[in-house]
UniProtKB/Swiss-Prot annotation:
Taxonomic placement: Bacteria, Pseudomonadati, Pseudomonadota, Gammaproteobacteria, Alteromonadales
Organism: Shewanella oneidensis (strain ATCC 700550 / JCM 31522 / CIP 106686 / LMG 19005 / NCIMB 14063 / MR-1)
HAMAP family associated with the record: GlmU
Name by which UniProt lists this protein: Bifunctional protein GlmU
Reaction catalyzed: alpha-D-glucosamine 1-phosphate + acetyl-CoA = N-acetyl-alpha-D-glucosamine 1-phosphate + CoA + H(+); N-acetyl-alpha-D-glucosamine 1-phosphate + UTP + H(+) = UDP-N-acetyl-alpha-D-glucosamine + diphosphate
UniProt GO MF annotations: glucosamine-1-phosphate N-acetyltransferase activity; magnesium ion binding; UDP-N-acetylglucosamine diphosphorylase activity
EC number per UniProt: 2.7.7.23, 2.3.1.157
Positions of region (N-acetyltransferase): 248-454
């Protein structure tokens, strides 16, 4: 029995006041619908039907080449009509799981519980109890059993008092779904084909209907405007921050951290305020991350430190390495064990060897730097000739004086010393001292010009 997921994503989202389709608005730098797609994949879906309408080109360009079946709903005539568009891709023996592209926080564990609750030949619906159920369809029960769902606009006063509401998420057998959708009517206050009407049909047909509930109501909340979108963003961030703390991280203020990807932490990690994580970030034990740091697709080993306001992207930090404050590691940068870069140092496609240091004001690009090297302030690897990038090699125990330019391709041998202010254009041998700056002159009796009075 295959798991066939139908994701409804056809709405325009007028209240968003945006040209972007509603489901493409982001939570943690990922579209709402992508969150739903990822969750569907995580529970082992065999097929995903994406029912779309408004903004087709933007949807397809954003979601790209994913394992999706694209189903056009040319007219938006209700949720039942939307699901009906996917019927040609649904087999009788499928379990059909219906999800919503603007409900991004639904958890895999909740969907697994819903699927487990579905009887072999029956239906399972996800419900939630709300203190204020205004706007939601009410779950109607008789002697504890679900007999139907009534929408807010069609409910009588007794039904409006019900606190258990429909989330719209349900698991239905494929053959029964086809039968019930064929029987839908739009004879209601909205003039739409309600998917929820199939629950009353199931009851009338003697089909068993079970329910499940999410751990938190926030899982099933959607976003119809930017205020609600921001609320979902905060809820998502709170959930991700909690995961980090449970895994072993101390967050200075859990409400002031942004997680926009997958972050793995070791034990005794200290994270200060206003840190942003993007992409895949792996953090070892006893790592310290200072305030305002931005860390993207990076691996950080045990005992490393990222000081405040550093930007680290596509980089690796070895054991006890440190960067910052105000440092920048660009893709391909690596700090080996005990290596250090300080304020206003930038590295790209460069390796700084074990125990080597670049304390301040340097650019190290396309460089292989050995162990025990000192990079003076103002050092620049001149790696670009206007057309191609070239490699600078600095071997172990080299001392590079301040304000030195190394014009690549160039190799500096072990133990060499480069005098401050030098421009190095040729290879330097081991243990050599190289000074290329102009010889200092002393002009005695020099008369400094004075300002002419007007």
């Amino acid at each position: 029995m295959a798991l066939n997921v139908v994701i409804l994503a056809a709405g325009k989202g007028t209240r968003m006041r945006s040209d972007l389709p509603k489901v493409l608005h982001p939570i943690a730098h990922k579209s709402m619908v992508q969150h739903v797609i990822d969750t569907a994949h995580s529970i082992g879906s065999d097929a995903i039907q994406l029912v779309y309408g408004y903004g087709a080109d933007k949807l397809k360009s954003t979601l790209g080449e994913q394992k999706l079946n694209w189903i056009l709903q040319a007219e938006q005539l209700g949720t039942g009509h939307a699901v009906a568009q996917a019927i040609p891709n649904i087999d009788d023996n499928d379990t059909v799981l219906i999800l919503y592209g603007d409900v991004p926080l639904i958890q895999a564990s909740t969907l697994e519980a819903l699927l487990a609750a579905r009887p072999e030949y029956g239906v399972a619906i996800l419900t939630v109890n709300l203190a204020n159920p205004m706007g939601y369809g009410r779950i109607v029960r008789e002697q504890g059993k679900v007999v139907g769902i009534v929408e807010q606009k069609d409910a009588n006063p007794e039904q409006l008092a019900i606190n258990e509401v429909n989330t719209g998420i349900m698991a239905v057998p494929g053959n029964a779904l086809k039968t019930w959708l064929d029987r839908l009517s739009n004879n209601n206050a909205q003039g739409e084909y309600y998917l929820t009407d199939i629950i009353a049909m199931a009851h009338a047909d003697g089909v068993e209907i079970n329910t499940a509930q999410p751990q938190s109501a926030i899982e099933v909340e959607g976003a119809n405007n930017r205020v609600q979108l921001a609320q979902l963003e905060r809820a998502y961030q709170a959930r991700e921050a909690e995961k980090l703390m449970i895994a072993g991280a101390n967050l200075r203020d859990p409400s002031r951290i942004d997680i926009r990807g997958e972050v793995t932490v070791g034990m005794d990690v200290m994270i200060d305020v206003n840190v942003i994580f993007e992409g895949k970030v792996v953090i070892g034990n006893n790592v310290t991350i200072g305030a305002g740091a931005i860390i993207i697709d990076t691996e950080i080993a045990d005992n490393a430190e990222i000081k405040p306001y550093s930007i680290i992207e596509g980089a690796k930090l070895g054991v006890a390495a440190s960067a910052g404050p105000f440092a920048r590691l660009r893709p391909g940068a690596e700090l080996m064990q005990d290596a250090h870069i300080g304020n206003f140092v930038e590295m790209k496609k460069a390796v700084l060897g074990v125990g080597s240091k670049a304390g301040h004001l340097a650019y190290l690009g396309d460089a292989q730097i050995g162990a025990g090297v000192n990079i003076g302030a103002g050092t620049i690897t001149c790696n670009y000739d206007g057309a191609n990038k070239h490699l600078t090699v600095i071997e172990d125990n080299v001392f590079v004086g301040s304000d030195t330019q190394l014009v690549a391709p160039v190799t500096i041998g072990k133990g060499a010393t480069l005098g401050a202010g030098s421009t190095i254009t040729r290879d330097v041998g081991e243990d050599e001292l190289v000074i290329t700056r102009v010889k200092q002159k002393h002009l005695t009796g020099w008369q400094r010009p004075v300002k002419i009075k007007k």
